Amino acid sequence: MELRERDVELIVSEVLKRLGPSGGTQGAPASPVGDFGLFDSLDDAVAAAEAAYKKVSSMAMRNKVVAIIRKTGLAHARMLAEMAVQETGMGRVDDKITKNTLVSEHTPGPEVLAPRAMSGDSGLTLEENAPWGVIASVTPSTNPAATVINNSISMISGGNAIVFAPHPGAKRVSQSAIQLINKAIIEETGIANLLVAVKEPTLEVARRLFAHPGVKLLVVTGGEAVVEAARKHATMRLIAAGAGNPPVVVDETADIRRAARSIYDGASFDNNIICADEKEIIAVESIADQLKQEMKALGAVEISLEQSDAIARFALRDYPGPNVAANPKWVGRNAALIAKEAGISVPESCRLLLVDIGRDINHAFARVEQMMPVLPLLRARNVEEAIAWAVLLERGLGHTAGMHSRNIDNMHSMALQMNTSLFVKNGPHLAALGAGGEGWTSMTISTPTGEGVTSARTFVRIRRCVLVDNFRIV
């Protein structure tokens, strides 16, 4: 069921009303209060967060708050998914429900923050995980509610409070997630403002946040432009999750049917707006036709080069010029909608458009992170050429790459040459984020600054206490 804007506003308003008064329960901080985490002033928001983080110093309280966030995320997974699609126009409701559920259930909590003790002839040393205090988190329009839920669990697990700076294009859904979580925390603990944001996010607010003296750590989840802006203006430590253009290589030894299913599921998920999703296929020539047929059997619709050119003319900016880039208006749109705009008839249920671009490694859809369900397929002579092309198209971003193969040497060679934070073998790239693979889930994959798949461990300071001599029991 598609929700209209007024319907969404009424639902959120009713949910917040049922959760209780904005002042919280007895014992909630009196100043500053805000509107369930939303403030007119950045200074008030930061001050409220600074007061809040001191109330989650105990692990017992952090565990309780994290459990509340998980419960709230699951309870409102569908509503927040519908809001995100309605507000941004990007992605698919069912896939966003999956993301909201995944981060609610599989983001690690305080349990991963074990202290470390070392003893020896010279005494005892203890290392513990201390909070930063107030963390600023810039969140994207592509994964708005999921990033708020994920970052909240990770950062509060470390004993922090968060000042969120949502993408203006996803302001309503991001702020609704913040308010819903705040309300639930207040209802059960009396603690307000562990999550805060400014009511009207602007470029000026973001710039002030990047250099705010009350913020100790800046976390940016977004594209190259926002990461570069943060690097330019930030006066504190920066953890950045930037862009990617993940290639997937399929060699002649691969299980082709399995590879087709993995790539289809990964590249079509939420209309390809997750940065780790498969963005281009590089198949060894000898199995390229078979791979294509298997993907078409799953529902992918093959389009011609001429049809892909028609799509590129509206879906990419400056096409076919030297500065070609994705047109934000078309990022994350349904495949059927993109096809219709180009005059191509496809079933409304179509999740993925597939275009065979042969050996054209300069094709715009291969070299640009377009974040749409339009997937190019390249044909390489052999696996060595396929890997070389993958390195070229990934552009050194260090984000994600994948390979389907039964040859361990080939997978090892590609993993070494790609040097990406995430490397997936014989599965959809989403497996690296805990969806069908081992490991935990995160919406903040820090590739430019090297932290990788973030968790509570990413958002703590390591403090060491040393007792010299005379405290050993052996």
Regions from the PLM with identified roles:
Residues 1-126, 154, 297:
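N-terminal Rossmann-like NAD(P)+-binding subdomain of aldehyde/semialdehyde dehydrogenases
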Residues 2-32, 117, 123-134, 335, ...:
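Terminal low-complexity tails and localization/encapsulation signals of metabolic enzymes
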Residues 59-64, 191-195, 271-275, 301-311, ...:
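Flexible, glycine/charged-enriched surface loops at secondary-structure junctions
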Residues 16-23, 46-57, 69-77, 81-84, ...:
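Structural signal for hydrophobic packing residues in well-ordered secondary-structure cores
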Residues 344-474:
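Conserved C-terminal structural/oligomerization subdomain of aldehyde/semialdehyde dehydrogenase
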Residues 115-258:
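Rossmann-like NAD(P) dinucleotide-binding subdomain of oxidoreductase/dehydrogenase enzymes
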